[in-house]
């Protein structure tokens, strides 16, 4: 694996000079191998090691290089034709392969090659970009989007119209991460490498970026870029110091543990916030 990484790192340093016409065989094969490994889930752009999320920047570099080495090509779809550098993940799937991999794909859901979809996942008409990782038992609901290199955990529900941000550039940025057993409410947006920790419930229409204040009403603490595990979060506002205006924030209205969450429905958690 180190040799593969070295090839990618070296090629990335001269990426401005690489085109589909002049790319050397070693680089092309290395990039294609990485995309294949991302596609199968053997590699992932970010993973949790000793309780901390670690981003493998060289894998993001390989994804960016794939845009340098490939020309646009005609892509056939169920309703139309497309013209792009990245093939669709399911272009060569037959019924036997869908059965083997064990997920459902509802038309016109679109998944780019280089994204991993685990077993028992359901993709409603939605979009999953290259480098993303969608773990077991997750529902990606209608018109939800999973951005490039985003990491979605097990048993997550991304409700209708949810946007999970992609983050190939700037290269040093970390991917957006939704940990296991989270619920993201309809039309919410989680972007810019924000981490929603395990078992959290995000209400409808909550917007989370790195600069968003995430206010815990019980403790008065303000978080940035991270929703603590087991949080129930709704949209809110915080007043300015002079009291003349207020600015948008997200509010942690309560914390729940796995036992409580298992007994109480999502709707009840969100309705009883007083």
Curated annotation (Swiss-Prot):
Biological process terms from the Gene Ontology for this record are: diaminopimelate biosynthetic process; lysine biosynthetic process via diaminopimelate
Q: Which reaction does it catalyse?
A: (S)-2,3,4,5-tetrahydrodipicolinate + succinyl-CoA + H2O = (S)-2-succinylamino-6-oxoheptanedioate + CoA
Instruction: Tell me if Repeat is a UniProt keyword of this record.
Output: yes
Quick one: which pathway?
Answer: Amino-acid biosynthesis; L-lysine biosynthesis via DAP pathway; LL-2,6-diaminopimelate from (S)-tetrahydrodipicolinate (succinylase route): step 1/3
| Compartments, record wording | Cytoplasm
Q: Which InterPro entries match?
A: DapD_Trfase_Hexpep_rpt_fam, Hexapep, Hexapep_transf_CS, THP_succinylTrfase_dom1, THP_succinylTrfase_N_sf, Trimer_LpxA-like_sf
What Enzyme Commission number(s) does the record list for this chain? Answer: 2.3.1.117
Give the matching Pfam families: Hexapep_2, THDPS_N_2
Q: Which GO terms describe its molecular function?
A: 2,3,4,5-tetrahydropyridine-2,6-dicarboxylate N-succinyltransferase activity; nucleotidyltransferase activity
Keywords carried by this UniProt record: Acyltransferase, Amino-acid biosynthesis, Cytoplasm, Diaminopimelate biosynthesis, Lysine biosynthesis, Repeat, Transferase
One CC-aspect GO term: cytoplasm
Family assignment? Belongs to the transferase hexapeptide repeat family.
Matching NCBIfam families, A to Z? dapD, PRK11830.1
Enumerate the PANTHER family for this protein: 2,3,4,5-TETRAHYDROPYRIDINE-2,6-DICARBOXYLATE N-SUCCINYLTRANSFERASE (PTHR19136:SF52), MOLYBDENUM COFACTOR GUANYLYLTRANSFERASE (PTHR19136)
Q: What is this protein called?
A: 2,3,4,5-tetrahydropyridine-2,6-dicarboxylate N-succinyltransferase
Q: What is the lineage of its organism?
A: Bacteria, Pseudomonadati, Pseudomonadota, Gammaproteobacteria, Enterobacterales
Gene that this sequence comes from: dapD
């Amino acid at each position: 694996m180190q040799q593969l990484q070295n090839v990618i790192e070296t090629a990335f340093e001269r990426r401005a000079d690489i085109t589909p016409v002049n790319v050397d065989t070693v680089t092309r094969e290395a990039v294609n191998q990485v995309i294949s490994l991302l596609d199968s889930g053997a590699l992932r752009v970010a993973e949790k090691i000793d309780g901390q999320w670690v981003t493998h920047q060289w894998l993001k570099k390989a994804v960016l290089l794939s845009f340098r080495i490939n020309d646009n090509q005609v892509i056939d779809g169920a309703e139309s034709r497309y013209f792009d550098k990245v093939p669709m993940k399911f272009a060569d799937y037959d019924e036997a392969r869908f059965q083997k991999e064990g997920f459902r794909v509802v038309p016109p859901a679109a998944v780019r090659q280089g994204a991993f979809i685990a077993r028992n996942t359901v993709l409603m008409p939605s979009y999953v970009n290259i480098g993303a990782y969608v773990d077991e038992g997750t529902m990606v609901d209608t018109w939800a989007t999973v951005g490039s290199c985003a990491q979605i955990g097990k048993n997550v529900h991304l409700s209708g119209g949810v946007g999970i941000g992609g983050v190939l550039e700037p290269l040093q940025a970390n991917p957006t991460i939704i940990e296991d057993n989270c619920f993201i409410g309809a039309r919410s947006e989680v972007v810019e490498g924000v981490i929603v920790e395990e078992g959290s419930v995000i209400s409808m229409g909550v917007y989370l970026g790195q600069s968003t204040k995430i206010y815990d009403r019980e403790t008065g603490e303000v978080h940035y870029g991270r929703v603590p595990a087991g949080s129930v979060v709704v949209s809110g506002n915080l007043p300015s110091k002079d009291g003349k205006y207020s600015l948008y924030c997200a509010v942690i209205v309560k914390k729940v543990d796995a036992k409580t969450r298992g007994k109480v429905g999502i709707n009840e958690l969100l309705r009883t916030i007083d």
